[in-house]
UniProtKB/Swiss-Prot annotation:
Species per Swiss-Prot/TrEMBL record: Bacillus licheniformis (strain ATCC 14580 / DSM 13 / JCM 2505 / CCUG 7422 / NBRC 12200 / NCIMB 9375 / NCTC 10341 / NRRL NRS-1264 / Gibson 46)
Name of the protein in its database record: ATP synthase subunit alpha
Subcellular location: Cell membrane
EC number: 7.1.2.2
Phylogenetic lineage: Bacteria, Bacillati, Bacillota, Bacilli, Bacillales
Gene: atpA
Annotated family: Belongs to the ATPase alpha/beta chains family.
Membrane-spanning residues: none
Superkingdom of the source species: Bacteria
C-alpha cells in the first residue's frame, strides 16, 4: 500500500498545527553549603518563611532563615545524598499535614506519613501545621469536665475540656502513664485523642501503641511519633502536626485531647536547629524565641464558642525536670503559659504513692469550674486534709504523746493517701470515685485498717454495682450527689458485710 506525497504533507501539517508547547516555570536555587541537616541555598529570592522546598533527590526541606544572599533550609529527611551544587525547587506550599477521620487508629510521622505498616492513609484533606490560635471572641470559658479516671487528679486538680494542664516531673515518675490512663478513660466519652511522642525510643512508642490497642483505645486515637533516631526538624515539627490534626476535629464541633510527650525534647531539638542556623543563643543556649515556640503551640488549645461549633481541644504538655527543679528555664516558661500543672515527685513515686502527684505544688487554674457538683462536694476538704497531714507527719516523728485531734488528723491523712493510690491502666469512672471519696471524707474509713483500704475500695465497688446501681447511675447522669441518707445507707450496708483482715 503506497502513501501519496500529499497525504504525508497533510499529516505533517496537522501535527505541526496541533503541537502545543507548555512552558513550566520553576523557581529554583542552588545548594551552596550542606551539613548537619541544614542546607544553605542561593537563588530562592521569592521563597516564603516556612515554605516547603524540594531537593533534586526528592527530599523535602523547610525554609527557615530568609537572609540577604541565601536561604537557610532545614532538611526533613536523609541529607547524605544532597551535595553542593544540587538544584532546589520551590513548591509554593506552606508545610501541611493530612487530617481527618482516616487517621484514627494509625501511627504516623510528623509529615503525616504512616509508619505502622498498614498501608497509606486515604485522606485528601490537609491543614497547615502553623495556623493562628482562636481569638478572644471565638472562645468560651471552660465548663465541661475532662475525666482522667485518676482519683488524685479528678478530685484535687480537675481538668476541663479546652484547658492546658502541664504534667511536670523527673524522668521515670509516671508522666506517660497518666496520659495513657487519661486516653483509656475517654472510651465512650465522644473524645478523640492524639498522642504525640517526641524523641521517645521506638520501643517505648511501640509499647504505648500496644497498650492502647489492648484496651480498645486505638480506635479513637492518632499516634504521631518522631522518635529519637529521627532528624531534629521532625522532633521540632511533631507537636504542630499533632495539634493541626486535632484542630480539624475541634472546628467540626468535636472534643479532642492532645498529649505532647514531651516538650523538653522539642525545645532541645529547636535549640539544635537554631544553633546550626547560626541564630544568636540566649539563656542555656536556647534561642530568644523558645517561649514563642511553646506559647503558639499551646494557645491553639481552646474551648470554642457555640457560634464556632462548641468544639474543644485540651492539651496535656509534658516537661521533664532535672532533680525536681521546676524553676529551670523551660519548666517556668511552660508553667506560665498553661492553666495549671500536675507535679509528679520522684520521692513519692519511690515510696509507693502512685500516681506520685504532689498536691501542694500542683494546681488547676480553671478546672474547678468544670468539676461535677458531686465531686466538688466530696473533694472540697481533701487538699486541706492532705496539706495538714503532711505538716503533722513531720512533727509526729519526734513526739509520741499526741492529742486526740492530731491523732485523728494523722489517721485520716494516712487513709486519704491510701485511697488516692491507683493501679496502672485502671482508670475509674467518676461515679465510683465519688463513692469512695464520700466514704473517706464522711469518716466511714476511719476505723478500717490502712492495709485494708484497697480491698475495701474494690469490694465497695462490687457491692454498689450489684445492690445500688441506681446510686452510681444517678451520679453519672445528673452530676449531683444523691441524698445523704441513700449514700450513708449504702455504705453502712456494705460495712456490715466487710471483714477487716486482722
Amino acid at each position: 500500500m503506497s502513501i501519496k506525497a500529499e497525504e504525508i504533507s497533510t499529516l505533517i501539517k496537522q501535527q505541526i498545527e496541533n503541537y502545543q508547547s507548555e512552558i513550566e516555570v520553576h523557581d529554583v536555587g542552588t545548594v551552596i553549603q550542606v551539613g548537619d541537616g541544614i542546607a544553605r541555598v542561593h537563588g530562592l529570592d521569592n521563597c516564603m518563611a516556612g515554605e516547603l522546598v524540594e531537593f533534586s533527590n526528592g527530599v523535602l526541606g523547610l525554609a527557615q532563615n530568609l537572609e540577604e544572599s541565601n536561604v537557610g533550609i532545614v532538611i526533613l529527611g536523609p541529607y547524605k545524598d544532597i551535595r553542593e551544587g544540587d538544584e532546589v525547587k520551590r513548591t509554593g506550599r506552606i508545610m501541611e499535614v493530612p487530617v481527618g477521620e482516616e487517621l484514627l487508629g494509625r501511627v504516623v510521622n510528623p509529615l503525616g506519613q504512616p509508619v505502622d505498616g498498614m498501608g497509606p492513609v486515604l485522606t485528601s484533606k490537609t491543614r497547615p501545621i502553623e495556623s493562628p490560635a482562636p481569638g478572644v471572641m471565638d472562645r468560651k470559658s471552660v465548663h465541661e469536665p475532662l475525666q482522667t479516671g485518676i482519683k488524685s487528679i479528678d478530685a484535687l486538680i480537675p481538668i476541663g475540656r479546652g484547658q492546658r494542664e502541664l504534667i511536670i516531673g523527673d524522668r521515670q515518675t509516671g508522666k506517660t502513664s497518666i496520659a495513657i490512663d487519661t486516653i483509656l478513660n475517654q472510651k465512650d466519652q465522644d473524645m478523640i485523642c492524639i498522642y504525640v511522642a517526641i524523641g521517645q525510643k521506638e520501643s517505648t512508642v511501640r509499647g504505648v501503641v500496644e497498650t492502647l490497642r489492648k484496651h480498645g483505645a486505638l480506635d479513637y486515637t492518632i499516634v504521631v511519633t518522631a522518635s529519637a533516631s529521627q532528624p531534629a526538624p521532625l522532633l521540632y515539627l511533631a507537636p504542630y502536626a499533632g495539634v493541626a490534626m486535632g484542630e480539624e476535629f475541634m472546628y467540626n464541633g468535636k472534643h479532642v485531647l492532645v498529649v505532647y510527650d514531651d516538650l523538653s525534647k522539642q525545645a532541645t531539638a529547636y535549640r539544635e536547629l537554631s544553633l546550626l542556623l547560626r541564630r544568636p543563643p540566649g539563656r542555656e543556649a536556647f534561642p530568644g524565641d523558645v517561649f514563642y515556640l511553646h506559647s503558639r503551640l499551646l494557645e491553639r488549645a481552646a474551648k470554642l464558642s457555640d457560634a464556632k461549633g462548641g468544639g474543644s481541644l485540651t492539651a496535656l504538655p509534658f516537661v521533664e525536670t532535672q532533680a525536681g527543679d521546676i524553676s529551670a528555664y523551660i519548666p517556668t516558661n511552660v508553667i506560665s503559659i498553661t492553666d495549671g500543672q500536675i507535679f509528679l515527685q520522684s520521692d513519692l513515686f519511690f515510696s509507693g504513692v502512685r500516681p506520685a502527684v504532689n498536691p501542694g505544688l500542683s494546681v488547676s487554674r480553671v478546672g474547678g469550674s468544670a468539676q461535677i457538683k458531686a465531686m466538688k462536694k466530696v473533694a472540697g476538704t481533701l487538699r486541706l486534709d492532705l496539706a495538714s497531714y503532711r505538716e503533722l507527719e513531720a512533727f509526729a516523728q519526734f513526739g509520741s504523746d499526741l492529742d486526740k485531734a492530731t491523732q485523728a488528723k494523722l489517721n485520716r491523712g494516712a487513709r486519704t493517701v491510701e485511697v488516692l493510690k491507683q493501679d496502672l491502666h485502671k482508670p475509674l469512672r467518676v461515679e465510683k470515685q465519688v463513692a469512695i471519696l464520700y466514704a473517706l471524707t464522711r469518716g466511714f474509713l476511719d476505723d478500717v485498717p490502712v492495709e485494708d483500704i484497697k480491698r475495701f475500695e474494690e469490694e465497695l465497688f462490687m457491692y454498689l454495682d450489684q445492690n445500688h446501681k441506681d446510686l452510681l447511675d444517678s451520679i453519672a447522669q445528673t452530676g449531683n450527689l444523691p441524698a445523704d441518707e441513700d449514700m450513708k445507707g449504702a455504705i453502712e450496708g456494705f460495712k456490715r458485710t466487710f471483714a477487716p483482715s486482722n
